[in-house]
């Protein structure tokens, strides 16, 4: 009886402990599942955030915000996800999220600084490479030119002499043409001067002829006027002579009348008788 009781009690204890173990195992399994789900959710969120950050960094690099304020706003929007949940399904505190945000900003600043440093370093290296390449190319070109000149020295001298002779011939031809143009220009100028002088002489002769004609006309007119004056003077003189003769005649007649020599009065005779 005692053994059966002990066995039954042990069996009941065993069943209770097994039930309790099953419950614990089921709880641990559910917890592990929740942990796994939370881990997956956090991973998916992290991957989404990373993708968002990458896309925003690309958009920032493409659009190039015009000021630090715009970049800070972009960074805040990129680094302000909803409340995070830990593996136990609990929300992470704001302080830890702020710390993570600050840490993330510092890491982004460091990454940006490192990227800018690498870009500057790459630009400096590219510039140095470009300068070195240009210097080497210049040296190589100068060396090749010098070698080519040395090889073709005689040919170059002959070509230079030929070009000098050709230039001399061209210059002589141009000089002769210039002298001929000057001579033709001088002849044309001389002809123009002679033509101008001839025209001036003809104009002077015409003016002299016109003056002589006017003088002759004036002289003829003056002579005619003088003849008229002489004729007038002659007429005046004749008229004066006529008047003088008429006056003398009248005077004589008056004297005759006064003296009685005319037929109108008898003649008076005076005789002296002689005494014996």
Swiss-Prot record:
Residues 1-117, 240-276 are annotated as: Disordered. GO terms for cellular component: chromosome; cytosol; mitochondrion; nuclear speck; nucleoplasm. Residues 1-77 are annotated as: Necessary and sufficient for RNA binding. Residues 67-87, 96-117, 240-256 have a biased composition (Basic and acidic residues). A motif (LXXLL motif 2) lies at residues 204-208. One of its GO terms (molecular function) is pre-mRNA binding. Pfam families: ARGLU (PF15346). The keyword RNA-binding applies. It is found in: Nucleus; Nucleus speckle; Chromosome. Dual function regulator of gene expression; regulator of transcription and modulator of alternative splicing. General coactivator of nuclear receptor-induced gene expression. This is Arginine and glutamate-rich protein 1. The gene is ARGLU1.
